């Protein structure tokens, strides 16, 4: 949380000198890969011996996957299932990255703006790639508005609106997670025992909310690119 584990700190320091990046960026890279490896191991454990009647890790993962899939279908409709791999991957990665910061000695990757920006750019590119693939060049009508003589003005406004989406996704997630880390650091500095516990419990709630908001906005943006322009 505040003091990284020695082994991971060693990797972070080596990476910092190798790539000439800041300590925060090096920590973000190391802990991002830590989360990725953790999720890969969890997936292998869950799928190692699949059973018709799931139990243990398989049962837990099926509940998570089914919950995300149902949410996608309820928000986007049946065609939203095709976007399940993208949205579920982002949601689970962000959630685990958020929760990792609550473990003493770990740094949440989402408390670094580079990590949140990467996730936001993926959503931004996916939104427009899906829109162009679905509508072809008619996708540009989304930027023109319903009145032809206002098209130049509407195009400018729509472009600004679309460019602001990855910025808002980036700063919302980064601001909340980084702010929570700073608050925890202050509480641990003042009273390192029981006082920070309420903030850590609130951190669990914040982690779930931020992952949910990011996933929900990703679904809304992609769904918007699929709708017919008027």
Swiss-Prot record:
Major localization listed first in the record, in broad terms: membrane
Gene Ontology molecular function terms on file: proton-transporting ATP synthase activity, rotational mechanism
Recorded coiled-coil stretches: none
Membrane topology designation: Multi-pass membrane protein
Pfam families, per database record: ATP-synt_A (PF00119)
Annotated GO CC locations: plasma membrane; proton-transporting ATP synthase complex
TM region(s), chain numbering: 26-46, 83-103, 112-132, 143-163, 182-202, 203-223
Keywords: ATP synthesis, Cell inner membrane, Cell membrane, CF(0), Hydrogen ion transport, Ion transport, Membrane, Transmembrane, Transmembrane helix, Transport
Subcellular location(s) per record: Cell inner membrane
Subunit annotation: F-type ATPases have 2 components, CF(1) - the catalytic core - and CF(0) - the membrane proton channel. CF(1) has five subunits: alpha(3), beta(3), gamma(1), delta(1), epsilon(1). CF(0) has three main subunits: a(1), b(2) and c(9-12). The alpha and beta chains form an alternating ring which encloses part of the gamma chain. CF(1) is attached to CF(0) by a central stalk formed by the gamma and epsilon chains, while a peripheral stalk is formed by the delta and b chains.
Similarity annotation: Belongs to the ATPase A chain family.
Function description: Key component of the proton channel; it plays a direct role in the translocation of protons across the membrane.
Protein name: ATP synthase subunit a
Gene that specifies this protein: atpB
